[in-house]
């Protein structure tokens, strides 16, 4: 009994395994795990991370393409279809009563208006039209950028031209069919004032052009504005007279254009054709007008004005014109006034007169009388101020100071002598500048005489009794290059004149007159102060020596530019040091002086 351990059941070991069978293969853990994971439904869930897209993306792309093509076809049919009939049905295009068969070209895609999807869409093949249809402008560009590009294109086109004015005149004539010169008269100076101005501007922003119609109303009594082919035309009748510079600055600030894009001249006031252009143009629908017609347009368009009597010549009008333009010579007056005949009725009447030469001589004499009276009425300070106002531009006053110091002259001493010289102080009103040749004596004195509009006397005319006559018509005079015979003559006959006393001066066709010599500049190669023979002139002269040669640059231009602008800056800078009076103190209660008038007409008429 003790030998039989456990229990033995016969027959049970045949259907029940009491022990597991061991093998070497089952000892591999990886193999065991793989075997445990196997099942009949193992492919039900895929654990693969890389999935293929399939045809869904391609399908979406095809749908988007179809929608885009449909939208494009609708836009083509709406905007670039050559005939409105095709918008209804292409089948109507094939119906024709004539035998004229035109070539066809397929323009649209397969999808059409929906009448017949299988019908081929055709349109006329006009070569020029198809070329224009193919060029569809981009829709994404904004209107503002287009305006800027258009303005820049106009300006760049203008800048590429060699002659800007000729280009603008050509564009104006092409736009309006009439020359700009035929509508306007020419003003040479930019500072000449006029109430009426004709302005042509090329390449203006349209929005700014529209706003200018309202902004200009506060400046003008009458406005005439139109636009054609990028050229904008203005007729402006200002409430107050303006010069060209003022008008251009106003329009540049208002329209944001460059001065090179503007043509500005006053209109022709006596031309019937010009007046009819403005009158008929005002009835155009594209023309904007504000205010009543100016007087000169009404006069030119009235029938009574055309049938009136011929105008008679008015001498005072001619004299006033010559005085305003500072013309005193007969030849200049005759030539310049004859050029005004197409625009000025009085000039036309003068040309038709038999006594043209007599009128010219009398006009020149009257202008000289008026100019001489105007000069005598002014003091030296007023005369210098009056002449400096006529000098345009600015210069450097230091150029004159450097030149004086270059010649070794104490500037304070020279300034003191110049002050006594300009004031005509007795025995101090004659300034002598001497030195070797080519030292700049004549250049220095001539530049001063030029800016002050003085007179030059020459000893070569000393045999004549009238060689000193120009001194009676000037505020300052110059005797250039005095030699020994000249010094002897002055020592013999001109001592009283250099003293600043009254002398008797013989003038042509006149009795001798009583005058005082104006301040006299003398240049010479002889130092009269060192000559004992001229000892009586020593107390009557103030002398300065120019010992150094006048310097020149490598390009043969002067080192010191003695210009009108330099003298203008010199006098303005040293006005108080020269003891010149203030112009406000010379007026009556500070009131502005009125312009001189010598014409028998009302003040509000046009010149």
UniProtKB/Swiss-Prot annotation:
Motif Nuclear export signal: where in chain: 88-97
Post-translational modification Phosphoserine, affected residues: 81, 89
Main location: host cell
Binding positions (ATP): 435-442
Matches recorded under InterPro entries: Helicase_SF3_DNA-vir, P-loop_NTPase, PPV_DNA_helicase_E1_C, PPV_DNA_helicase_E1_N, PPV_E1_DBD, PPV_E1_DBD_sf, Rep_E1_papillomaV, Znf_lg_T-Ag_D1_dom_sf
SUPFAM superfamilies: Origin of replication-binding domain, RBD-like, P-loop containing nucleoside triphosphate hydrolases
Any one GO biological process: DNA replication
The protein's name: Replication protein E1
Organism: Human papillomavirus 24
């Amino acid at each position: 009994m003790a030998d039989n351990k456990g229990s033995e059941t016969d027959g049970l070991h045949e259907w029940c395994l009491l022990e597991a069978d061991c093998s070497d293969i089952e000892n591999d853990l990886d193999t065991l795990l793989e075997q445990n994971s196997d099942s009949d439904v193992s492919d039900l869930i895929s654990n693969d991370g890389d999935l293929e897209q399939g045809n869904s993306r391609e399908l979406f792309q095809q749908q988007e393409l179809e929608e885009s093509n449909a939208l494009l076809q609708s836009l083509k049919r709406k905007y670039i279809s050559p005939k409105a009939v095709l918008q209804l049905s292409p089948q109507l295009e094939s119906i024709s009563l004539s035998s004229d068969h035109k070539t066809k070209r397929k323009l649209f895609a397969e999808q059409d208006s929906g009448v017949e999807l299988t019908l081929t869409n055709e349109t006329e093949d006009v070569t020029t039209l198809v070329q224009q249809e193919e060029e569809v402008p981009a829709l994404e560009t904004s209107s503002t950028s287009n305006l800027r590009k258009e303005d820049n294109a106009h300006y760049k086109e203008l800048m590429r031209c060699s002659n800007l004015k000729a280009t603008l005149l050509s564009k104006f004539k092409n736009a309006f069919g009439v020359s700009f010169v035929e509508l306007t008269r020419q003003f040479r100076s930019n500072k000449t004032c006029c109430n009426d101005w004709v302005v042509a501007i090329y390449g203006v922003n349209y929005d700014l052009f529209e706003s200018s119609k309202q902004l200009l109303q506060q400046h003008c009594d009458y406005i005439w504005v139109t636009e054609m082919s990028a050229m904008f035309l203005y007729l402006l009748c200002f409430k107050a007279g303006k010069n060209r510079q003022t008008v251009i600055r106003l329009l540049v600030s208002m329209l944001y254009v460059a001065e090179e894009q503007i043509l500005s001249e006053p209109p022709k006031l006596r031309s019937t054709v010009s007046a009819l252009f403005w009158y008929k143009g005002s009835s155009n629908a594209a023309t904007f007008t504000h205010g009543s017609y100016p007087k000169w347009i009404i006069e030119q368009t009235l029938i009574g004005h055309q049938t009136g009597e011929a105008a008679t010549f008015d001498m005072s009008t001619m004299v006033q014109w010559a005085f305003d333009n500072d013309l005193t010579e007969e030849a200049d007056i005759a030539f310049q006034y004859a050029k005004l005949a197409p625009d000025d009725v009085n000039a036309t009447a003068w040309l038709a007169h038999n006594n043209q030469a007599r009128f010219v001589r009398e006009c020149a004499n009257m202008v000289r009388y008026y100019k001489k009276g105007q000069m005598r009425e002014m003091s030296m300070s007023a005369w210098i101020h009056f002449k400096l106002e006529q000098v345009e531009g600015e210069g450097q006053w230091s150029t004159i100071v450097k030149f004086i110091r270059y010649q070794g002259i104490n500037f304070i001493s020279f300034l003191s002598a110049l002050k006594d010289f300009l004031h005509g102080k007795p025995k101090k009103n004659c300034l002598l500048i001497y030195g070797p040749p080519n030292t700049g004596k004549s250049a220095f004195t001539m530049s001063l005489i030029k800016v002050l509009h003085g007179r030059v006397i020459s000893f070569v005319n000393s045999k004549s009794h009238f060689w000193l006559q120009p001194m009676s018509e000037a505020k300052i005079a110059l005797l250039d290059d005095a030699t020994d015979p000249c010094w002897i003559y002055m020592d013999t006959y001109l001592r009283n004149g250099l003293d600043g006393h009254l002398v008797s001066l013989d003038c042509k066709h006149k009795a001798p007159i009583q005058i005082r010599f104006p301040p006299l500049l003398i240049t010479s190669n002889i130092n009269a102060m060192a000559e004992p023979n001229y000892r009586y002139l020593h107390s009557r002269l103030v002398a300065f020596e120019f010992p150094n040669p006048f310097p020149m640059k490598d390009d043969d231009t002067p080192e010191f530019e003695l210009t009108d602008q330099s003298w203008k800056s010199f006098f303005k800078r040293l006005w108080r040091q020269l003891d010149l009076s203030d112009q406000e103190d010379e007026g009556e209660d500070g009131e502005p002086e009125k312009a001189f008038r010598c014409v028998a007409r009302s003040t509000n008429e046009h010149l």
